[in-house]
Every structure is written in structure tokens, then in C-alpha cells.
């Protein structure tokens, strides 16, 4: 379906307004909501295209600027070494509590909209995969998709590099989908095994999917992009969202 991608909101948080971009079907109606958390580069072209694709399948998609208190509104970091260095510096400058507050604010923004059914999911990529994992600890989140989520295995998200994401994994009550590239140096085999073992330990409802891909294999810019793998994994994501958000999970 065709979409609208021109809606911008400044969502209130205790650390200042969080610029948030909304993508939605053009047709009037009520739709499930999805928060898309970006990579360390913020709301880039590839992130916008991912949001548009999800919206075109019948969802309201909110994309917040993850570094809104550290970067000017509208700032996009380049896919180069300088951009990566700045994005990683920001990742470790921001307080863990601020990441969590931002997630709650983005979810609340969707839920209060008249065009939202109130059924909510999250998806994230790289840094955003970890943010989606933490956002799923909110009881309103029925489904979460984490693409090669960084820092979960090492517990190093946020200022001080000491998060409690694995410790709190048992708080996630919705359905999880974790997607990994086996050639991703940011989350090696040992790290992936640590995450999976913890999810098994807390009896999480999750699907685990590993592919022969590099870090950033779904980003449709650069030499690591693998279109075949990307579309395959997007299919898994949409299947989860359709079952849990659009059609409704009878268990919830």
C-alpha cells in the first residue's frame, strides 16, 4: 500500500524533545504501531526506507532520533569512520535510563494516536536492536525484532558501559525474533551463545535465526548489503508482526 512519510513530531522527554518521524499507510484507518530504533548513525536513508517498507505493510512506524539530547534535531551521521566514531561516542555518552525513557515515550506517542489500534511492536538494527530488546521489557510490547543487536552480550550499553539487559531478560513477555550475521565481529559466536542461553534460561518466547552475513547486511548502502538475505529476514519480521500485531495473538 502507498504511504505517507511527512509527519514529524517532537516527543517530550526529560532530556528534551525527541524528534520522531512517522511513516504510515496513506489510507485512513487504524493500524498497529511499531517503533523502529536506528543504528548509531540515526535516521539515515536506509533507515527511512526500512520504515517506509514496514508502513507499506499496514503499520504506523515511529522512528525516534536516538541521540536527540546529544545531536541537533535532524542530524544524520555519515556512513564513514568519522560518523562511526561519533555514533559510538554518543552511544556511550548517553545514560541507560535515557534510552529506556525514550522507548517509553515513543511507545506512548504511538499508543495515544487516534490512528493506532494500541497493539505495539518494536524493531531495531545494530544499536537499535539492543534498544528494541530493552523496549520489549515494557508490557505493551507484543513483539520485538532485533537485527544483530550490539552490546547485549557484553553488557556495555550506555554511559559507564554497564547495562543490565541480560539480567532483565525475563521481563520480556512478548515474542522475540533475533537475527544475526555469523560473520559479524561485533557479536561473535561466544556472545550470541551467551544471549541465547539466557533467553532459554528465562523461558523466553523467541525465534533465533543466524545467516551467513556480515554486520549491517540489511543496510541497503555499502559493500556489506546482501539483498537476498535482507528480504528473507524482512519476511520473518513481517510474519511476526502480522501474527502478533495485525491479526492479534490469542494469548494476549
Model-derived regions, located:
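N-terminal cap/leader regions of alpha/beta-hydrolase-fold enzymes
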Residues: 1-252
Amino acid at each position: 500500500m502507498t504511504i505517507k512519510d511527512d509527519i514529524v513530531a517532537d516527543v517530550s522527554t526529560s532530556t528534551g524533545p525527541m524528534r520522531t518521524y512517522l511513516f504510515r499507510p496513506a489510507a485512513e484507518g487504524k493500524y498497529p504501531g511499531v517503533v523502529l530504533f536506528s543504528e548509531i548513525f540515526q535516521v539515515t536513508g536506509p533507515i527511512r526506507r526500512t520504515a517506509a517498507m514496514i508502513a507499506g505493510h499496514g503499520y504506523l512506524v515511529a522512528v525516534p532520533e536516538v541521540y536527540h539530547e546529544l545531536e541537533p534535531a535532524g542530524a544524520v551521521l555519515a556512513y564513514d569512520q568519522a560518523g562511526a566514531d561519533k555514533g559510538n561516542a554518543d552511544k556511550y555518552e548517553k545514560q541507560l535510563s535515557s534510552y529506556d525513557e525514550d522507548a517509553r515515550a515513543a511507545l506512548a506517542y504511538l499508543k495515544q494516536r487516534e490512528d493506532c489500534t494500541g497493539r505495539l511492536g518494536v524493531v531495531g538494527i545494530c544499536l537499535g536492536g539492543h534498544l528494541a530488546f530493552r523496549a520489549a521489557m515494557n508490557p505493551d510490547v507484543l513483539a520485538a525484532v532485533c537485527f544483530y543487536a550490539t552490546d547485549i552480550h557484553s553488557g556495555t550499553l550506555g554511559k559507564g558501559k554497564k547495562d543490565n539487559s541480560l539480567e532483565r531478560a525475563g521481563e520480556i513477555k512478548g515474542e522475540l525474533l533475533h537475527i544475526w550475521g555469523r560473520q559479524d565481529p561485533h557479536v561473535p559466536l561466544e556472545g550470541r551463545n551467551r544471549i541465547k542461553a539466557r533467553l532459554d534460561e528465562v523461558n523466553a518466547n523467541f525465534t533465533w535465526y543466524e545467516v551467513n552475513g556480515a554486520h549491517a547486511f540489511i543496510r541497503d548502502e555499502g559493500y556489506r548489503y546482501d539483498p537476498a538475505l535482507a528480504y528473507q529476514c524482512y519476511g520473518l519480521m513481517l510474519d511476526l508482526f502480522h501474527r502478533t500485531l495485525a491479526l492479534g495473538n490469542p494469548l494476549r
